Amino acid sequence: MQAAKTQDELVKTFKAILKEERFGSQSEIVIALQAEGYNNINQSKVSRMLSKFGAVRTRNAKQEMVYCLPAELGVPTAGSPLKNLVLDVDHNQAMIVVRTSPGAAQLIARLLDSIGKPEGILGTIAGDDTIFITPSNIQEIDKTLITVKSLFNFTN
């Protein structure tokens, strides 16, 4: 299980690095990932990841050729599995925040509102890709967080 978590963290870090749009070579990406603590990464692995996630080289705002990820895919459809639309679930001591694919927040929020108080959800506010969840009892926010994560098979 630890290996899977490490792989998930690597993917998240890899995507974050590419979003910076400042790495022009695979070796620069390797160095950046190694600086983040992924010592077993090499150019071959980076090459496979770039291919897997559809990364392309393009010009950034400074007109430098850099690797970047393609824009998010289109608006979710009714056939989109809901668990694939949830990108991140996090919380502080008062609120749970769910990040979704663009356009999916209201759909997910409606589902969460339908579950309601029995599962610890007082209410939601949804934008385009972010949902704020107010727990019905702040002392039980961890339990509500587990419920929300389990709904979408979210393991992080």
Swiss-Prot record:
Subcellular location field: Cytoplasm
Molecular function per GO: arginine binding; DNA binding; DNA-binding transcription factor activity
UniProt xrefs under SUPFAM superfamilies: C-terminal domain of arginine repressor, Winged helix' DNA-binding domain
Keywords, alphabetical: Amino-acid biosynthesis, Arginine biosynthesis, Cytoplasm, DNA-binding, Repressor, Transcription, Transcription regulation
Involved pathway(s): Amino-acid biosynthesis; L-arginine biosynthesis [regulation]
Cellular component per GO, a single term: cytoplasm
GO BP term, example: protein complex oligomerization
Cited HAMAP family: Arg_repressor
Function: Regulates arginine biosynthesis genes.
UniProt-listed NCBIfam families: argR_whole, PRK05066.1
Family statement drawn from the similarity comment of this UniProt entry: Belongs to the ArgR family.
Protein name: Arginine repressor
Organism in which the protein naturally occurs: Shewanella woodyi (strain ATCC 51908 / MS32)
Lineage of producing organism: Bacteria, Pseudomonadati, Pseudomonadota, Gammaproteobacteria, Alteromonadales
